[in-house]
Amino acid sequence: MAVDSREKGKRGEYQVRDILRERTGLEWERVPGSGAFGQSHGLKGDIYLPPQSGHISKYCFEVKWYKDDNISSNLFNVGESTLEKWWQQCSREGEQMNSKPALIFKKDRGQWLIALDSSDPMVDNLMSRTHMVLNKKDMEIVIGLFEPWLHHASVEDLIK
């Protein structure tokens, strides 16, 4: 049975939204249309805090869910890897929103991972556990497990 990648992406965004809601008690939402709506309403990323929540996220959360383990291909080659392309999108949208980029991604049947810029103070929550650092071209990111990172973050760490 073929999988609709848009539906899969939407399910992933809802999963991450629900994890954020459960941990923070805030009413995080999925950006309607995940991009299409955002283009005309100034929203970037996939998950945000709506104005009626009374809060603004410090992070531009971009969510990716992939099937094949091709994320590491080209990491050490001249070409761009899938991970680098995702990070560029997340960074660009974060800059447009005046927010920090936070890429949340997973492989089928895997755990949610998070990638943060190495200069982000919240990387300390990643560095104290199993993690990896990717330094290539003009990016240096730290990757670790999303849920333990979030568990050790306070609401104040996530909102402006």
UniProtKB/Swiss-Prot annotation:
Recorded GO MF terms: nucleic acid binding
Keywords, ordered alphabetically: Early protein
Record's keyword annotation contains Translocase: no
Induction details: Expressed in the early phase of the viral replicative cycle.
Keyword Transit peptide: no
InterPro entries for the chain: D14-like (IPR056931), tRNA_endonuc-like_dom_sf (IPR011856)
One Pfam family recorded for the sequence: PDDEXK_15
Protein name: Protein D14
Organism name: Escherichia phage T5 (Enterobacteria phage T5)
Classification of source organism: Viruses, Duplodnaviria, Heunggongvirae, Uroviricota, Caudoviricetes
Encoding gene, per UniProt annotation: D14
